Amino acid sequence: MSEIILTPKEQPEVPLEAPNIKPDVFAGKSIDEIKNIQIMHGNEVVKLGDFFEVSGEPADAPEDIKIIIDGDVYNTKRIGQEMTAGEIIVRGNVNMYVGAGMKGGKITVEGNAGSWAGQDMRGGEIEILGDADDYVGSSYRGDWRGMSGGTITVHGNADNEIGEYMNGGKIIIKGDVNIMPGIHMNNGLIIIEGNVVARAGGEMAGGTIVVKGMMQEFLAGFKYLGVEKDIELMVKNSPGAFYKFEGDHAIKGAKGIVYAAVGCNGHIAP
Protein backbone atom coordinates (compact mmCIF):
# COMPACT_ATOMS: atom_id res chain seq x y z
CA MET A 1 0.00 0.00 0.00
CA SER A 2 1.39 3.41 -0.99
CA GLU A 3 1.78 5.96 1.80
CA ILE A 4 1.11 9.67 1.41
CA ILE A 5 2.21 11.71 4.42
CA LEU A 6 0.59 15.01 5.37
CA THR A 7 2.53 17.01 7.96
CA PRO A 8 0.64 20.01 9.40
CA LYS A 9 2.51 23.30 8.99
CA GLU A 10 0.44 25.10 11.64
CA GLN A 11 -2.82 24.97 13.57
CA PRO A 12 -5.12 27.55 11.97
CA GLU A 13 -7.21 29.74 14.27
CA VAL A 14 -10.15 29.37 11.88
CA PRO A 15 -10.97 25.67 11.33
CA LEU A 16 -10.24 23.92 8.05
CA GLU A 17 -12.97 21.94 6.27
CA ALA A 18 -11.18 19.13 4.47
CA PRO A 19 -13.52 16.43 3.10
CA ASN A 20 -11.06 16.01 0.22
CA ILE A 21 -8.49 14.43 2.53
CA LYS A 22 -9.33 10.86 1.56
CA PRO A 23 -7.90 8.16 -0.73
CA ASP A 24 -10.75 8.61 -3.23
CA VAL A 25 -9.57 12.14 -4.05
CA PHE A 26 -5.81 11.42 -3.83
CA ALA A 27 -6.03 8.43 -6.21
CA GLY A 28 -4.39 8.96 -9.60
CA LYS A 29 -2.81 12.29 -8.62
CA SER A 30 0.84 13.27 -8.36
CA ILE A 31 2.24 14.85 -5.18
CA ASP A 32 2.04 18.29 -6.78
CA GLU A 33 -1.58 17.71 -7.76
CA ILE A 34 -2.39 16.58 -4.22
CA LYS A 35 -0.86 19.81 -2.87
CA ASN A 36 -3.29 21.73 -5.10
CA ILE A 37 -6.42 19.95 -3.85
CA GLN A 38 -8.95 22.47 -2.57
CA ILE A 39 -10.05 22.71 1.07
CA MET A 40 -11.91 25.43 2.96
CA HIS A 41 -10.40 27.85 5.49
CA GLY A 42 -13.40 29.64 6.91
CA ASN A 43 -15.09 31.12 3.83
CA GLU A 44 -11.94 30.97 1.71
CA VAL A 45 -10.97 28.27 -0.77
CA VAL A 46 -7.32 27.34 -0.17
CA LYS A 47 -4.92 24.61 -1.26
CA LEU A 48 -4.02 21.58 0.82
CA GLY A 49 -0.35 22.49 0.41
CA ASP A 50 -0.95 25.84 2.13
CA PHE A 51 -1.42 24.04 5.43
CA PHE A 52 0.31 20.65 4.97
CA GLU A 53 3.64 19.39 3.75
CA VAL A 54 2.90 16.55 1.34
CA SER A 55 5.23 13.64 0.58
CA GLY A 56 5.14 9.96 -0.29
CA GLU A 57 4.24 7.64 -3.14
CA PRO A 58 0.96 8.17 -5.04
CA ALA A 59 -1.19 5.32 -6.36
CA ASP A 60 -3.94 5.00 -8.94
CA ALA A 61 -6.58 3.22 -6.86
CA PRO A 62 -8.07 4.40 -3.52
CA GLU A 63 -7.71 0.94 -1.99
CA ASP A 64 -3.95 1.15 -2.54
CA ILE A 65 -3.51 4.43 -0.63
CA LYS A 66 -2.74 4.99 3.04
CA ILE A 67 -2.85 8.64 4.12
CA ILE A 68 -0.82 9.38 7.26
CA ILE A 69 -1.51 12.73 8.93
CA ASP A 70 1.65 13.12 10.98
CA GLY A 71 0.55 15.46 13.74
CA ASP A 72 -2.35 17.08 15.54
CA VAL A 73 -5.24 18.36 13.41
CA TYR A 74 -7.64 19.32 16.18
CA ASN A 75 -8.81 22.27 14.08
CA THR A 76 -9.47 20.33 10.86
CA LYS A 77 -12.96 18.97 10.17
CA ARG A 78 -14.45 16.32 7.85
CA ILE A 79 -11.33 14.24 7.26
CA GLY A 80 -12.31 11.06 5.41
CA GLN A 81 -15.86 12.22 4.72
CA GLU A 82 -17.63 9.78 2.36
CA MET A 83 -14.46 7.77 1.72
CA THR A 84 -15.01 4.37 0.11
CA ALA A 85 -11.64 2.60 0.33
CA GLY A 86 -8.06 2.84 1.53
CA GLU A 87 -6.81 3.95 4.92
CA ILE A 88 -6.26 7.13 6.93
CA ILE A 89 -4.15 7.33 10.09
CA VAL A 90 -4.21 10.51 12.20
CA ARG A 91 -1.26 10.70 14.58
CA GLY A 92 -2.95 13.09 16.98
CA ASN A 93 -6.35 14.65 17.67
CA VAL A 94 -8.96 15.44 15.03
CA ASN A 95 -11.94 17.78 14.87
CA MET A 96 -15.59 17.13 14.03
CA TYR A 97 -17.14 14.85 11.39
CA VAL A 98 -14.21 12.48 10.90
CA GLY A 99 -15.47 9.66 8.65
CA ALA A 100 -18.93 11.21 8.19
CA GLY A 101 -20.84 9.35 5.49
CA MET A 102 -18.01 6.84 5.20
CA LYS A 103 -18.75 3.81 2.99
CA GLY A 104 -15.53 1.76 3.18
CA GLY A 105 -11.90 1.65 4.20
CA LYS A 106 -10.46 2.37 7.64
CA ILE A 107 -9.71 5.49 9.69
CA THR A 108 -7.53 5.34 12.81
CA VAL A 109 -7.32 8.35 15.12
CA GLU A 110 -4.47 7.95 17.58
CA GLY A 111 -5.75 10.79 19.79
CA ASN A 112 -9.21 12.19 20.53
CA ALA A 113 -12.03 12.91 18.06
CA GLY A 114 -14.52 15.77 18.01
CA SER A 115 -18.28 15.44 17.76
CA TRP A 116 -20.14 13.55 15.01
CA ALA A 117 -17.43 10.97 14.32
CA GLY A 118 -18.90 8.53 11.80
CA GLN A 119 -22.07 10.56 11.32
CA ASP A 120 -24.36 8.76 8.83
CA MET A 121 -21.66 6.10 8.37
CA ARG A 122 -22.60 3.30 5.96
CA GLY A 123 -19.56 1.02 5.92
CA GLY A 124 -15.90 0.68 6.78
CA GLU A 125 -14.19 1.05 10.14
CA ILE A 126 -13.27 3.93 12.45
CA GLU A 127 -10.99 3.33 15.42
CA ILE A 128 -10.41 6.13 17.95
CA LEU A 129 -7.66 5.37 20.45
CA GLY A 130 -8.56 8.28 22.75
CA ASP A 131 -11.92 9.82 23.67
CA ALA A 132 -14.82 10.90 21.44
CA ASP A 133 -17.17 13.84 21.90
CA ASP A 134 -20.94 13.86 21.30
CA TYR A 135 -22.98 12.10 18.59
CA VAL A 136 -20.73 9.21 17.56
CA GLY A 137 -22.47 7.42 14.66
CA SER A 138 -25.43 9.81 14.75
CA SER A 139 -27.70 11.38 12.12
CA TYR A 140 -27.42 14.77 10.50
CA ARG A 141 -29.36 17.51 12.29
CA GLY A 142 -33.02 17.20 11.33
CA ASP A 143 -32.63 13.75 9.78
CA TRP A 144 -34.02 10.54 11.30
CA ARG A 145 -31.45 8.15 9.80
CA GLY A 146 -28.11 7.78 11.50
CA MET A 147 -25.31 5.28 11.04
CA SER A 148 -26.44 2.26 9.01
CA GLY A 149 -23.29 0.14 8.61
CA GLY A 150 -19.67 -0.30 9.54
CA THR A 151 -17.96 -0.34 12.93
CA ILE A 152 -16.81 2.46 15.24
CA THR A 153 -14.55 1.60 18.18
CA VAL A 154 -13.63 4.17 20.84
CA HIS A 155 -10.95 2.99 23.25
CA GLY A 156 -11.57 5.83 25.72
CA ASN A 157 -14.78 7.54 26.82
CA ALA A 158 -17.61 8.99 24.72
CA ASP A 159 -19.95 11.84 25.51
CA ASN A 160 -23.67 12.33 24.81
CA GLU A 161 -26.15 10.71 22.39
CA ILE A 162 -23.92 8.16 20.71
CA GLY A 163 -25.81 6.15 18.08
CA GLU A 164 -28.60 8.73 17.82
CA TYR A 165 -31.13 7.45 15.22
CA MET A 166 -28.79 4.51 14.53
CA ASN A 167 -30.07 2.16 11.80
CA GLY A 168 -27.33 -0.46 11.62
CA GLY A 169 -23.68 -1.24 12.18
CA LYS A 170 -21.84 -1.46 15.47
CA ILE A 171 -20.45 1.01 18.02
CA ILE A 172 -18.07 -0.21 20.73
CA ILE A 173 -17.08 2.10 23.59
CA LYS A 174 -14.32 0.68 25.79
CA GLY A 175 -14.73 3.38 28.45
CA ASP A 176 -17.66 5.30 29.94
CA VAL A 177 -20.53 7.12 28.23
CA ASN A 178 -22.51 10.16 29.32
CA ILE A 179 -26.26 10.49 28.74
CA MET A 180 -28.66 9.00 26.19
CA PRO A 181 -26.67 6.42 24.22
CA GLY A 182 -28.92 4.91 21.53
CA ILE A 183 -31.54 7.67 21.66
CA HIS A 184 -34.11 7.12 18.85
CA MET A 185 -32.19 3.98 17.83
CA ASN A 186 -33.88 1.72 15.24
CA ASN A 187 -31.34 -1.02 14.54
CA GLY A 188 -27.71 -1.98 15.08
CA LEU A 189 -25.61 -2.73 18.13
CA ILE A 190 -24.00 -0.54 20.80
CA ILE A 191 -21.62 -2.16 23.30
CA ILE A 192 -20.50 -0.03 26.26
CA GLU A 193 -17.83 -1.69 28.36
CA GLY A 194 -17.82 1.02 31.03
CA ASN A 195 -20.57 2.95 32.83
CA VAL A 196 -23.50 5.01 31.53
CA VAL A 197 -24.69 8.11 33.37
CA ALA A 198 -28.37 8.08 32.35
CA ARG A 199 -31.21 7.34 29.92
CA ALA A 200 -29.74 4.61 27.75
CA GLY A 201 -32.05 3.77 24.85
CA GLY A 202 -34.42 6.71 25.27
CA GLU A 203 -37.19 6.43 22.63
CA MET A 204 -35.42 3.53 20.91
CA ALA A 205 -37.67 1.43 18.66
CA GLY A 206 -35.21 -1.36 17.81
CA GLY A 207 -31.60 -2.44 17.99
CA THR A 208 -29.54 -3.64 20.94
CA ILE A 209 -27.54 -1.89 23.66
CA VAL A 210 -25.20 -3.83 25.96
CA VAL A 211 -23.88 -2.12 29.10
CA LYS A 212 -21.15 -4.08 30.86
CA GLY A 213 -20.69 -1.44 33.55
CA MET A 214 -23.23 0.42 35.70
CA MET A 215 -26.23 2.37 34.44
CA GLN A 216 -26.68 5.08 37.05
CA GLU A 217 -30.24 5.88 35.93
CA PHE A 218 -32.63 3.89 33.73
CA LEU A 219 -35.86 4.88 32.02
CA ALA A 220 -39.30 3.68 33.11
CA GLY A 221 -40.41 2.73 29.59
CA PHE A 222 -38.55 -0.59 29.54
CA LYS A 223 -40.10 -3.98 30.34
CA TYR A 224 -38.02 -6.48 32.32
CA LEU A 225 -37.65 -9.82 30.48
CA GLY A 226 -35.39 -11.73 32.86
CA VAL A 227 -31.72 -12.68 33.11
CA GLU A 228 -29.63 -14.05 30.25
CA LYS A 229 -26.14 -15.49 30.42
CA ASP A 230 -23.31 -15.34 27.88
CA ILE A 231 -25.25 -13.38 25.30
CA GLU A 232 -23.97 -13.55 21.75
CA LEU A 233 -24.32 -10.47 19.58
CA MET A 234 -23.07 -10.18 16.00
CA VAL A 235 -20.44 -12.92 16.40
CA LYS A 236 -18.86 -11.49 19.59
CA ASN A 237 -19.63 -13.20 22.92
CA SER A 238 -20.39 -11.13 26.01
CA PRO A 239 -19.72 -13.46 28.96
CA GLY A 240 -21.57 -13.09 32.26
CA ALA A 241 -25.17 -12.58 33.36
CA PHE A 242 -27.25 -9.66 32.08
CA TYR A 243 -30.62 -8.20 32.95
CA LYS A 244 -32.65 -8.01 29.75
CA PHE A 245 -35.12 -5.18 29.08
CA GLU A 246 -37.38 -4.39 26.11
CA GLY A 247 -38.45 -0.89 25.08
CA ASP A 248 -38.61 2.04 25.02
CA HIS A 249 -42.39 1.60 25.34
CA ALA A 250 -42.82 5.34 25.18
CA ILE A 251 -42.68 4.42 21.46
CA LYS A 252 -45.58 2.31 20.15
CA GLY A 253 -44.48 -1.20 19.17
CA ALA A 254 -40.90 -0.70 20.37
CA LYS A 255 -38.71 -3.82 20.23
CA GLY A 256 -35.37 -2.43 21.36
CA ILE A 257 -33.29 -4.50 23.76
CA VAL A 258 -31.04 -3.25 26.56
CA TYR A 259 -28.76 -5.67 28.40
CA ALA A 260 -27.26 -4.50 31.72
CA ALA A 261 -24.61 -6.51 33.59
CA VAL A 262 -26.10 -8.12 36.71
CA GLY A 263 -23.00 -7.53 38.80
CA CYS A 264 -23.20 -3.73 38.41
CA ASN A 265 -26.92 -3.03 38.18
CA GLY A 266 -28.79 -4.51 41.11
CA HIS A 267 -30.33 -1.08 41.69
CA ILE A 268 -32.40 -1.35 38.48
CA ALA A 269 -33.49 -4.98 38.97
CA PRO A 270 -37.25 -5.43 39.53
From Swiss-Prot:
Keywords, sorted A to Z: Methanogenesis, Oxidoreductase, Repeat
Reactions mediated catalytically: N-formylmethanofuran + 2 oxidized [2Fe-2S]-[ferredoxin] + H2O = methanofuran + 2 reduced [2Fe-2S]-[ferredoxin] + CO2 + H(+)
Gene Ontology terms describing biological process: methanogenesis, from carbon dioxide
GO molecular function: formylmethanofuran dehydrogenase activity; transition metal ion binding
Ranges of the Sequence repeats in the UniProt entry: 80-92, 99-111, 118-130, 144-156, 163-175, 182-194, 201-213
Keyword Metal-binding (UniProt): no
InterPro entries: FMH_DH_FwdC, Formylmethanofuran_DH_suC, Glu_synth_asu_C_sf
Record's note on what induces expression: By growth on tungsten or molybdenum under anaerobic conditions.
Segments for region (7 X 13 AA repeats of [GW]-X-X-M-X-X-G-X-[IL]-X-[IV]-X-G): 80-213
Domain of life: Archaea
Enzyme Commission numbers on file: 1.2.7.12
Pathway assignment: One-carbon metabolism; methanogenesis from CO(2); 5,10-methenyl-5,6,7,8-tetrahydromethanopterin from CO(2): step 1/3
Its job: Catalyzes the reversible oxidation of CO(2) and methanofuran (MFR) to N-formylmethanofuran (CHO-MFR). This enzyme is oxygen-labile.
Family: Belongs to the FwdC/FmdC family.
Oligomer and partners: This enzyme is composed of six subunits FwdA, FwdB, FwdC, FwdD, FwdF and FwdG.
Name assigned to this protein: Tungsten-containing formylmethanofuran dehydrogenase 2 subunit C
Organism of this sequence: Methanothermobacter wolfeii
Record gene name: fwdC
